[in-house]
Curated annotation (Swiss-Prot):
The gene is pgsA. It is found in: Cell inner membrane. This is CDP-diacylglycerol--glycerol-3-phosphate 3-phosphatidyltransferase. GO terms for biological process: phosphatidylglycerol biosynthetic process. It is a multi-pass membrane protein. It catalyses: a CDP-1,2-diacyl-sn-glycerol + sn-glycerol 3-phosphate = a 1,2-diacyl-sn-glycero-3-phospho-(1'-sn-glycero-3'-phosphate) + CMP + H(+). Residues 38-60, 108-145 are periplasmic. InterPro entries: CDP-alcohol_PTase-I, CDP-OH_P_trans, CDP-OH_PTrfase_TM_dom, CDP_ALCOHOL_P_TRANSF_CS, PGP_synthase_bac, Phosphatidylglycerol_P_synth. HAMAP family: PgsA (MF_01437). Keywords: Cell inner membrane, Cell membrane, Lipid biosynthesis, Lipid metabolism, Membrane, Phospholipid biosynthesis, Phospholipid metabolism, Transferase, Transmembrane, Transmembrane helix. Its EC number is 2.7.8.5. Catalyzes the conversion of cytidine diphosphate diacylglycerol (CDP-DG) and glycerol 3-phosphate into phosphatidylglycerol. Essential for the synthesis of anionic phospholipids, thereby playing a role in balancing the ratio of zwitterionic and anionic phospholipids, which is thought to be important for normal membrane function.
Amino acid sequence: MQFNIPTLLTLFRVALIPFFVLAFYLPFVWAPLLCALIFVFAAVTDWFDGFLARRWKQTTRFGAFLDPVADKVMVAVALVLVAEYYHSWWITLPAATMIAREIIISALREWMAEIGKRSSVAVSWIGKVKTTAQMMALFALLWRPERIVEGIGVAALYIAAVLTFWSMFQYLNAARHDLLEP
């Protein structure tokens, strides 16, 4: 297997996860900002690696597999850390909802690919809006410099949770005939 720059960026994103967790637990006043910046850097490389792979025509099967996995693991870890920090149901509930949705839709996409219908559950615009709201929420809730930023983060988290449900139902609806077929 030959590694290209987009794939190396994705691997780097995976390698950032332990440092991201470590930054979250550092006992310094600047640690939340460092943690949030690592998260944003990972989000930017998520966009950038896909852009470069398409632009340079360097898409690979390994990259196509690893990119969404790296994204989902980073987001799931961030959601767990945020839920752990706030230690309350009103943060844990949307976080758990988003993690569950990612597992359900990943399984659905894998199954649809297996039956040759992967394109019917391709990423939609609502999924992209959900991801944007999720990234904004997580950045704000990881950084949390002031109450107003936390409030914006919580609002964005709930917007992301609603969009999470909406997009999940869209994907399940698109696959319903195949799911319900005997």
